[in-house]
Structures are given as structure tokens and as C-alpha cells.
Amino acid sequence: MNALGRHVIAELYGCGFDVLNDVKRVEEIMVRSALEAGAEIREVAFHKFSPQGVSGVVVISESHLAIHTWPELGYAAVDVFTCGDTVDPWDATNYLAKEFGAKYMTAKETKRGVMVEEFAESQAVNL
């Protein structure tokens, strides 16, 4: 079965408070991770929460990268979803873990849009 994309869901633990709470730094790291993986960036949106935390998304031609941080816990939840086979989501994920200084990471990959033959042939949507 072929998949339309690969989605890596990562949990980053033991990251520094200051980096996870700095919206500009988080944005820079996320953008660089997309570029390091060979993605083409389309849009970038990040938000700083009060008293702490950052959420953001980097929309790429191949799909997206998203992050939500809990600086007080040294934790970041990361999604890297890529379509096609030109961008490896693990390249971006590993870059993020390194740049956020994660002491521990758990991650799993899910295939998205796995096309079951009977549905792949149909172009109509019947719900």
C-alpha cells in the first residue's frame, strides 16, 4: 500500500526554559529545521502565550511542521508531516531535538493517506 505522506509525532523532554519560551527563537529553529530537511516554506505563524509557552506552524509545500511548548516543564510537542518523498520528516525532527537541547525524545511515524485499492480508484466522496 502506498501512503500520501509521513507524519512524525515527537515528544521532546528536558529542553531549556529560555529557548522554549522565546517565540523568535522557536520560530527560527522551526524554519531552519524545515529548510534543513529540504522543504519549501510557504507560510509561518507563531504565537507567544502569557505567562509562558509558544505555539506555531510552518506551512510547507509538502505539508507542515507544528510545535506547542510548555517551558515550565521543559517539554515540546512537535508534529512534522510531509507529503511525497523529497522531504524526510525525521531530518527535521532530529534537527529540532538537537536545537531545543532535548535530553530525551520519543517519536513515532504514522503513514498518512494509506490508499486502500478500492477507495483509491474512486474520486467521489460519499459519507
UniProtKB/Swiss-Prot annotation:
Swiss-Prot/TrEMBL GO biological process terms: spermidine biosynthetic process
Site keyed Cleavage (non-hydrolytic): positions: 62-63
UniProt-listed Pfam families: AdoMet_dc
PTM note: Is synthesized initially as an inactive proenzyme. Formation of the active enzyme involves a self-maturation process in which the active site pyruvoyl group is generated from an internal serine residue via an autocatalytic post-translational modification. Two non-identical subunits are generated from the proenzyme in this reaction, and the pyruvate is formed at the N-terminus of the alpha chain, which is derived from the carboxyl end of the proenzyme.
GO CC annotation: cytosol
Catalytic activity: S-adenosyl-L-methionine + H(+) = S-adenosyl 3-(methylsulfanyl)propylamine + CO2
Cofactor, free-text remark: Binds 1 pyruvoyl group covalently per subunit.
Enzymatic class: lyase
Keyword annotations: Autocatalytic cleavage, Decarboxylase, Lyase, Polyamine biosynthesis, Pyruvate, S-adenosyl-L-methionine, Schiff base, Spermidine biosynthesis, Zymogen
Gene3D superfamilies assigned to the protein according to its UniProt record, in alphabetical order: 3.30.160.750, S-adenosylmethionine decarboxylase domain
Protein name: S-adenosylmethionine decarboxylase proenzyme
Gene source species: Carboxydothermus hydrogenoformans (strain ATCC BAA-161 / DSM 6008 / Z-2901)
